[in-house]
Amino acid sequence: MKAFVGIDPGVKGSLAVLTETATPPMYHVELIPWADDLAPYIEALKSKEGPSWQVSCALEHVGAMPGQGVKSMFNFGKVFGEVIGVLTTLKVPFELVRPQRWQKEFGISGDKSEHIAVCKRLFPNVSLLRTPRCRKDDDGHADALLLAEWSRRHHG
């Protein structure tokens, strides 16, 4: 079986897993919001271990943003390093993908509402809400799902 993972490592980021479920390919989508605890990420990735799985991961490669403070840059770097550590430890092959590269694939810019619109078009049955109580679609879920789709298109 094949699984394609997309990770938006930001503070409001997410991990998305597209799992091939049938032939012709149909995909199950799993979205996990970022939390202070990496356990949900680890469990999602560990469930795809073993010789019967082919896993490919696209990790968004972003740097410091203009105007960010030292503390927020440090926190982002910490999270980014933790995610790379988890992927490396679990032997999940991953590619660092700059936002401009994966966004070009979908014909979008940095406007988060565009990301959500493209996600809804590609995955009309997937909820992008962070929690059931949310009213607004989550751009972290959208970015992670688009990264997973980018991985599927390039490594599928």
Language-model features, listed with the residues they occupy:
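Phosphate- and other anionic-substrate recognition elements at nucleic-acid/protein interfaces
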Residues: 1-156
